[in-house]
Amino acid sequence: MKTLTLIGAGTAAILLATGAMAQDREGWPASFTVGTASQGGTFFVYGSGWANLVAEELGLTGAGEVTGGPMQNMALVHNGDLAFGLTTLGPAAESIAGTNPIAPGLAMDNVCAMFPMYQTPFHMAALSSQGITTLSEIPDGTVIGFGPAGSSADTYFPLMLEALGVSYERRNGGWDDLGGQLQDGLIDAIGFAAGVPIPTVSQLEVQTEISVVGFTDEELAVVTENFPVAAYAVSADTYRSLDEDLSSVAMWNFAIANCDLPESFVYEATRIAMEDNARMMNVHSSAAESLPEHWDKNNVLMWHPGAARWFNENGGASIAADMIHGG
């Protein structure tokens, strides 16, 4: 009789736990997709890896999706075509203001912040034979690839070069494709904005001789005064082509969620990214900056209630109610 009582209690406990889980998962999708960018870029590696972690731990189907990058991710997440995405705060601010070129005039305000990822440095790669050592001295007519249309590189790097007085021919494409064009001599240089090390740059270093070009002090002064970026040093051990730290500028990247997603779902997806940095570092080394303490780098997006709850309860954050969607 005692045995039967114990079994009954255990069964009741299991039923209670199952009921609680079902209640907590109310409204959860059976599958989800993370908008990343082109293959060969850090967004694709980071977003796909994080999606796999979330899917595995929560028992869902999830994957990264190749997209045009931050601008398109803002549009896709806003419309609910994607649950999650990755963006850069500059393009995010433009999207909220209604100046996203994908949908001019549409304020993409149904996109919420989830967690800080890493900073995106801007730098250039060129064949060593081109002799390009500084951005300001790039010869007129140089053909430069800037990644997919609407990417952070495509949005800001051309404007930076114009501010530095550079005249160039513009090309767009995925990072892997542009890397192949550079090797084949179809373009002269690539202007990158992605978490380091950028897979395409690392691959180029193995296959040919390249120069990785940053910003001089004078160029830094011009760019930081005119664009929403801050000075950033790319460590010398990032690329084989560097003998010393590379002077650059950078913007912060954040993971984003559709604001209508259930609070408990976004809480769990945020927890998985933030509670074990070593696991995220296994996805991509840029996740070294994916730390809860960087929550305060977001001054653009409203926070998803689930993400805000995780940071306020576990990340030492103090996200105010007026910065939380629906708060």
Task: Enumerate the language-model features and the residues they cover.
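Bacterial N-terminal signal peptides
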Residues: 8-15
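An extracytoplasmic/periplasmic, membrane-proximal ligand-sensing/linker region
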Residues: 29-30, 177, 184, 194-208, ...
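Sec/Tat signal peptide C-region and signal peptidase I cleavage site
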Residues: 18-22
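N-terminal segment of the mature folded domain
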Residues: 78-114
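Ligand-binding clefts/hinges and TM-proximal coupling segments of bilobed small-molecule sensing domains
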Residues: 140-156, 227-299
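Pocket-lining segment of extracytoplasmic ligand-binding domains
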Residues: 89-91, 98-102, 130, 166-261
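Bilobed "Venus flytrap"/periplasmic-binding protein-like clamshell domains
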Residues: 29-57, 61-62, 120-184, 278, ...
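Bacterial N-terminal signal peptides that target proteins for export
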Residues: 1-8
